[in-house]
Amino acid sequence: MTSRSTEKSAAANPAAVSKTPSPDRIRRAPKVLLHDHLDGGLRPGTIVELARETGYGDLPETDADLLGTWFRQAADSGSLERYLETFSHTVGVMQTRDALVRVAAECAEDLAEDGVVYAEVRYAPEQHLEKGLTLEEVVEAVNEGFREGERRARDNGHRIRVGALLTAMRHAARSLEIAELANRYRDLGVVGFDIAGAEAGYPPTRHLDAFEYLKRENNHFTIHAGEAFGLPSIWQALQWCGADRLGHGVRIIDDIQVHEDGSVKLGRLASYVRDKRIPLELCPSSNLQTGAADSYAEHPIGLLRRLHFRATVNTDNRLMSHTSMSREFEHLVEAFGYTLDDMQWFSVNAMKSAFIPFDERLAMINDVIKPGYAELKSEWLFQQTASTSGSSESDG
């Protein structure tokens, strides 16, 4: 049904190489993150310290560097069992109020240090109740941590705003309860709802009561779909459940045909997703780990960007994928020859798709994102001009 598109890399496009942003400019560029799991982004050192403080004794390593390596190797192992084990350890140390506050604060700090100016970070409150916390106490602790992290970032000269997405697990039966929780805290730091977990055997239609409730309440939600299970999960998420965004959505490529002459034909579902501007929360490094693509150069994001889908770049699980927003863009710059213009396109796409009011999204685009990229482009142009001038004088 589909033919994969392999976009040209920067190495095959010499004209683009001179415009390739440096790692430093990529880091300083204002970036927007829509798909990041709180329990997938802890600092290894924090895990070790929290395990000691909370009495969690199941860590595979107690040295922070060795533990970080273990997480990366487990995630890259190709074993679903080992991959899921990584989350048992992060969630295992996130069972107290103080731990949740700390993890959320450090998350905001780390993202801000990486140049992220707006982020929506998701977590499942139902997974943090083992030591007696209530759902409400979990949400309030995480919100407190995000606000503390924003303050620390400001003190360090960085600007970031973090909103929470409350996630319900697909295999459980608490989605309506979590949706109601998201609605109660929607003006107190929570910006939307999500469902996550194994797609196969747990279609989003099992949680229709939660989605129907959220639609009645005029609330926002995204659904993990089209990561592993393919087009049926995307179709159900959109047409049965009414999702505002697609968590991953990378398998929409299965409904796109690329012919030998380079022409492209979109199927009905792919056309609908593009025409309706449905945001795709693409996570390149994570997709490589799960087998959705064999390399960055073969990742569908190249074709989806060329076809003007509402594509966004995300991290998914920063610890497990050993990644950051800057690293994701570095990989894409190398694979596709992307410039600061491309980075701005992805960042504006993401900001347009955020679950905050229109005027606030517009202000972020016009007051933060566009000026930030304009400054970096001017800086690059000045350096290019100075370099050319210096070369001419030398030749003379």
Swiss-Prot record:
Active site per database record: 227
Q: How is its activity regulated?
A: Coformycin and 2'-deoxycoformycin, whose structures mimic the transition state of the deamination reaction, are potent competitive inhibitors.
Q: Could you state a single Gene Ontology molecular function term?
A: 2'-deoxyadenosine deaminase activity
Q: Which Gene3D superfamilies match?
A: Metal-dependent hydrolases
Q: Per the UniProt record, which EC number(s) apply here?
A: 3.5.4.4
Cofactor dependence is on:
Zn(2+)
Cross-referenced HAMAP family: A_deaminase
Q: Which family does it belong to?
A: Belongs to the metallo-dependent hydrolases superfamily. Adenosine and AMP deaminases family. Adenosine deaminase subfamily.
The protein's name? Adenosine deaminase 1
User: What organism does this protein naturally occur in?
Assistant: Streptomyces coelicolor (strain ATCC BAA-471 / A3(2) / M145)
Gene symbol here is: add1
